[in-house]
Amino acid sequence: MTELPERSAATTGGAKTARDVSSLIAELGLTAEDSIEPTALVPPERLREVALALRDRGFMLMDTVGVDYGAFPERIPARFCVLHNVYHIKDRCRLFLRVWLEEGQALDSLYPVWRAANYLEREVYDLFGIEFVGHPDLRKILTPDDLEGHPLRKDFPLGESPTLFREGRFIDPPAFRAGLSGQNAGLTGWRGEFRRGERGDRVPPVLPEGGPQ
């Protein structure tokens, strides 16, 4: 059997790579966040500059996500953050860039740096309402054009749609929630305090007055 040569730590994501990433964060003049994955805190005004430096070192943009920390119990710098996931294929090295944003604050688009930012930033805009300055076509990508608001914001109202199942069962959201709390049969037809593994009396779901709407 032919033995494969051992890969160096720099190409296997080992300790050397971790030290290299820490050194890179410091070299860029950024602060490292205390987290499981290497994460750098990037001031909004420096994002494109940092992205260009990383691209020139061989990093590519893998993903961009938004987070709404509204009602988060711990103290945080701002309500929103945009997290860019960049990766160096040759070194198998990953780095996250976290940018904190206040309500209504826009962020420079990374489309001029990585074309992959096109759809990624459109998704963040659609779901959180965060605008990206310099994006060539910033518009919705997932939700209908006539939907008002941004669904992944914490202040977005939760919608409810009655559901008619193929076998004729009908359930509406209030009944579903009541079933989960044991107040009535709910979605599954089980009633009472028997939802933790104990069998109770099986009760057929009750259709609303007038039948399915």
UniProtKB/Swiss-Prot annotation:
It is a peripheral membrane protein. NDH-1 is composed of 15 different subunits. Subunits NuoB, C, D, E, F, and G constitute the peripheral sector of the complex. GO terms for molecular function: NADH dehydrogenase (ubiquinone) activity; NADH:ubiquinone reductase (non-electrogenic) activity; quinone binding. One of its GO terms (cellular component) is plasma membrane. Keywords: Cell membrane, Membrane, NAD, Quinone, Translocase, Transport. PANTHER family: NADH DEHYDROGENASE [UBIQUINONE] IRON-SULFUR PROTEIN 3, MITOCHONDRIAL, NADH DEHYDROGENASE UBIQUINONE IRON-SULFUR PROTEIN 3. This is NADH-quinone oxidoreductase subunit C. Gene3D superfamilies: NADH:ubiquinone oxidoreductase, 30kDa subunit. InterPro entries: NADH_DH_suC, NADH_quin_OxRdtase_su_C/D-like, NADH_UbQ_OxRdtase_30kDa_su, NADH_UbQ_OxRdtase_CS. Pfam families: Complex1_30kDa. Its EC number is 7.1.1.-. Belongs to the complex I 30 kDa subunit family. It is found in: Cell membrane. NDH-1 shuttles electrons from NADH, via FMN and iron-sulfur (Fe-S) centers, to quinones in the respiratory chain. The immediate electron acceptor for the enzyme in this species is believed to be a menaquinone. Couples the redox reaction to proton translocation (for every two electrons transferred, four hydrogen ions are translocated across the cytoplasmic membrane), and thus conserves the redox energy in a proton gradient. It catalyses: a quinone + NADH + 5 H(+)(in) = a quinol + NAD(+) + 4 H(+)(out).
